[in-house]
């Protein structure tokens, strides 16, 4: 639902990628701006992939002054592992310590 999407955006550090005033990419960081950050909802529209835009988006995020003190970055992804590995992401050292809780909301 749009209401949940809007609330998630309001409570995140968001970055958009634009071409001729049209949004073609996006990423958001859920963070306390001190220790932890969760990278989420990263995308570049398919017709704009292969142009280095994902790299520019990641560079912008990881170089942003407000995000320099983050000690632990996390993400969940089904693809683009190669891109994220270039920024130091890897499988959890102790996956048995990672837990999640899902709640059906709609």
Model region roles, listed by residue range:
Residues 16, 22-31, 38-43:
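Conserved beta-strand in the GNAT
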Residues 48-57:
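Conserved acetyl-CoA pyrophosphate-binding loop and the N-cap/start of the following alpha-helix
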Residues 65:
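Hydrophobic pocket-lining residues that define ligand/cofactor binding sites across diverse proteins
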Residues 31-39, 49, 94-95:
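A conserved beta-turn-beta hairpin within the catalytic core of GNAT-like acetyltransferases
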Residues 55, 69-102:
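Conserved active-site alpha-helix within GNAT-family acetyltransferase domains
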Residues 1-14, 18:
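Active-site rim helix/loop that mediates acceptor-substrate recognition in acyltransferases
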């Amino acid at each position: 639902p749009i209401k949940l999407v809007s609330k998630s955006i309001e409570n995140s550090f968001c970055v958009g990628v634009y071409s001729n005033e049209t949004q073609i990419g996006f990423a958001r960081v859920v963070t306390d701006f001190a220790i932890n950050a969760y990278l989420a909802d990263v995308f570049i529209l398919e017709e704009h992939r292969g142009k280095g835009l994902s790299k520019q988006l990641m560079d912008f995020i990881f170089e942003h002054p407000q995000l320099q003190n983050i000690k632990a970055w996390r993400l969940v992804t089904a693809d683009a592992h190669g891109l994220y590995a270039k920024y130091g992401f890897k499988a959890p050292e102790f996956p048995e310590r990672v837990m999640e809780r899902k709640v059906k909301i709609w």
